Amino acid sequence: SGFCCAISWNKAIRYPCKSELYSKRVETYLWFEKHAPLDFDLYGVGWENPPAKSGMIGRVISKLYNFFPMRSGVFRRCYKGKIVSKTDVLGDYKFAICYENYKGLKGYITEKIFDCMFSGCIPIYWGAENVLDYIPSECFIDRRNFKDEQSLYDFLKSMDAITFNTYQEKIAAFLDSQSAKKFYIENYVDKVSSVILER
């Protein structure tokens, strides 16, 4: 099994803003590519090309890569290609980078962190300002607690088996709780159905 991975598209936001995490995601990938390539694998679409840039020029450049693909992108050592199943890939790793597209938004928690937890992989999360209102701190590694990628990496590498297993036990307990069930797809379907029936 692998150490750490990430699954994402190589894309950027249309207009730069201070709360976006697309660029932070790329910074983390680049750090691993340079400093710890053997401990990180990157999956997804488009990473054979350089990281996407925001704005009109960035979109034009990205479209050009569709016609003139790069023979080797920035992530030559870490990029492992496209995937068929997130669950199968994540299940082969101890940790996964799962940054939301934006930080600081309350309640903005997408499937990224849950994909990791359901796969038995410990998420390294950055996103919702109030994530701890929904998910216990013992269930994920909060990227906000580290000043840079080096300190995050040192923490991951120093984690012993007991601590790792404790994370997994806490994740399993959380996923089996009522607190987690509000994020299940069945709950969304029930809510949508109830709204439709009320009309």
Predicted regions span which residues?
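Two-component system phosphotransfer/interaction surface
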Residues: 149-160, 189-193
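Conserved donor-nucleotide binding/catalytic region of nucleotide-linked donor-dependent transferases
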Residues: 157-176
